[in-house]
Regions:
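Long, well-ordered, tryptophan-enriched scaffold segments
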Residues: 180, 199-254
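Acidic/histidine-rich catalytic neighborhood of metal-dependent amide-processing enzymes
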Residues: 251-254, 281-284, 294, 299-442
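N-terminal hydrophobic or amphipathic helices/low-complexity stretches enriched
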Residues: 17-80, 285, 316-331, 539, ...
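His/Asp/Glu-rich mid-to-C-terminal helical/loop segments that flank catalytic regions of hydrolases
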Residues: 493-551
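Second-shell loop/turn segments in exported
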Residues: 26-34, 50-60, 90-92, 136-137, ...
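Noncatalytic luminal/extracellular "stalk/propeptide" segments of secretory-pathway proteins
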Residues: 53-156, 161, 242-247, 251-254, ...
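Short, solvent-exposed loop/turn and secondary-structure capping segments
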Residues: 58, 102, 147-149, 169-170, ...
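Metal-dependent peptidase/peptidase-like ectodomains
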Residues: 113, 200, 209-212, 217-221, ...
Length: 551
């Protein structure tokens, strides 16, 4: 039996949303086998340091981050399970950058790339636009009145409103135009002109529809009439020209390690435990004052939550112009009395420095145990999650152990927050759970049983696991790449917060006792699964591994 290394009854997390008393920089002591807040803090401060440059997949920061993980698993004595006897599995990513000399015309009028249209390409080779008509299909908010798929076939389909499901509704579209309010185009334009990271695949050269985001003011250039005068089925201009991209290889790497099991037969089966090692890199628009940005986003989120009782899609979004102006006055006052702390690095302390540290803590606990679990433990730190789950997609398509030998996968992504001021309903016992019963009732029951065995158990929040939930969290982290092959999974997360995908996601704002409590739960679940006398029973339908994820 493994030694109990963390008594959950003695873990009393502070509210992670409160003003942090932790330092900007911290150097901890060498880590020990016990899963402790001090060890987790030491790891996150290293992994989410500015020197890691935001850990973007396919960039030097990603190399630095994975090198740190590799040093740790080597020190722990784990077995390499990557390529050619190493801990690394190469993932063939590449970047695709818009060629701003691309030329496109609507009838005889020249269109200005980025200004009139901001193309976002999802992969493959853009379908040719030469000689194609634009058709306005309507708004996805009222699908009953939209143009039919037959009307749209072979044309560039223009829509307004939300875009979810547009590609499924119009499979014969040669391209898509999405109209957006002029005021929202800034971020889209920056994204369109930056390099997009993608995964090499067999259909790299397959023609796929290009999506162009167009400001409402430019709608007449494509439709021939203002957007407010367009009706579903309106056929507009004819496009001429092409949109071109420059492609550059940007290889990245997963880190893969094994703790061999103790049973001579069951050690050939694996319980996978994972997190993602990448984040967003550097802010393309340049440095911002970190403290005033955080102050703005905190106030903005409080206003949005009070109005809607849910988190905004991104911190600072969902406000009226009047609300933004009011907050800016307060933030300008703060900036006037405090020195600027300029920053352009997306440190990703919670996303997913917390998960990476948690998995390392779990690995060190089992590596230091006198009695090992019966089944082997497979630790995978995936790359490319932020760009599209690429590392986990590559690993599950090219596993370094038999895919059928993986009995379950436990995914940890963002486990360092969850306070009352972070998320509605948050607190010391808060934890989101997704997917635990989507393939295996037994796995879901086992997670619940382990949790209930603690003196101070978590209160699991299952709301984001609901079928059809608009956030689609089940489809948005690495666990799904395992689930698509019928491997039972559970996704553990403390959820979103004001620093999500901001340069303010820094180590000093994490709740390390809460992180440790989650990591201990995951370790105990992994141990239970690894010591079962049978494989976790799959009693639910398996998805199509090549199909689209639908929650």
């Amino acid at each position: 039996m493994l030694v109990v290394v963390a008594s959950l009854s003695h873990i009393e997390p502070r509210d992670a949303g409160a003003q942090s008393a932790l330092p900007l920089k911290y150097t901890g002591k060498p880590t020990q086998p016990a899963i402790t807040a001090d060890d987790a803090m030491s790891r996150v401060y290293i992994f989410a340091d500015d020197s890691m440059m935001g850990r973007a997949a396919g960039h030097i920061g990603g190399i630095k981050g994975t090198a740190y993980i590799e040093r740790e698993v080597r020190r722990l004595g784990l077995v390499p399970a990557g390529d050619n006897g190493t801990f690394f599995q190469a993932v063939p990513l590449f970047t695709r950058t818009l060629d701003t000399s691309s030329r496109l015309m609507a009838d005889t009028a020249a269109l200005t790339v980025v200004t009139d249209y901001a193309p976002i390409h999802a992969g493959g080779k853009p379908r040719p636009l030469e000689g194609l008509k634009v058709i306005y299909a309507g708004s996805m908010t009222d699908q009953s009145s939209m143009a039919s798929p037959e009307q749209a076939a072979g044309k560039v389909v223009a829509v307004s409103g939300p875009t979810s499901g547009v590609a499924r509704k119009y499979p014969g579209a040669m391209g898509f135009i999405v109209f957006r309010p002029d005021a929202t185009m800034g971020q889209i334009r920056r994204f369109a002109t930056g390099p997009a990271t993608q995964l090499r695949s067999a259909d790299d050269t397959a023609a796929k529809p290009l999506t162009m985001y167009v400001p409402v003011s430019a709608a007449p250039k494509f439709l021939g009439v203002p957007l407010e005068n367009a009706r579903p089925g309106t056929v507009g201009r004819t496009l001429h020209g092409e949109v071109r991209y420059t492609v550059v290889d940007a290889p990245a790497r997963n880190v893969v390690a094994i703790l061999p099991g103790s049973d001579p037969v069951l050690k050939n089966q694996y319980v996978a435990i994972g997190a993602h090692n990448d984040h967003l890199g550097m802010r393309r628009a340049g440095p911002v004052d970190t403290d005033s940005m955080r102050a703005f986003n905190r106030i903005a989120s409080q206003i949005y939550i009070a109005r809607t009782h849910e988190l905004p899609d991104l911190p600072g979004s969902g406000l009226t112009p009047e609300e933004r102006a009011s907050i800016k006055i307060n933030v300008d006052s703060l900036r006037a009395i405090r020195p600027l702390r300029l920053d352009s690095i997306y440190n990703g302390a919670d996303d997913d420095g917390s998960g990476t540290a948690g998995v390392l803590e779990i690995a060190e606990r089992f590596a230091g145990a006198k009695v090992k679990p019966k089944r082997s433990l497979l630790f995978v730190w995936h790359t490319g999650e932020e760009d599209g789950l690429y590392g986990s997609e590559w690993y599950t398509d090219h596993p370094t152990v038999s895919r059928d030998s993986i009995v379950a996968q436990l995914n940890i992504d963002m486990i360092g927050r969850g306070g009352a001021s972070d998320i509605p309903g948050g607190g010391p016992a808060y934890l989101q759970l997704l997917g635990s019963r989507r393939l295996s009732t037994e796995l879901g029951d086992l997670v619940e049983a382990v949790n209930k065995s603690y003196p101070n158990p978590f209160k699991f929040d299952y709301q984001f696991d609901a079928t059809g939930h608009p956030e689609q969290y089940y489809c948005r982290s690495d666990h799904y790449e395992y689930a698509r092959y019928g491997i039972p999974i559970t996704f553990f997360s403390t959820g979103g917060h004001v620093d999500y995908h901001q340069v303010t996601d820094e180590p000093q704002y994490l709740n390390y006792p809460h992180l440790v409590k989650v990591a201990t739960l995951v370790a105990d679940v992994a141990e239970r699964v690894a010591n079962l006398g049978h494989r976790v029973v799959v009693d639910k339908p398996k998805p199509d591994p090549k199909g689209e994820c639908v929650q």
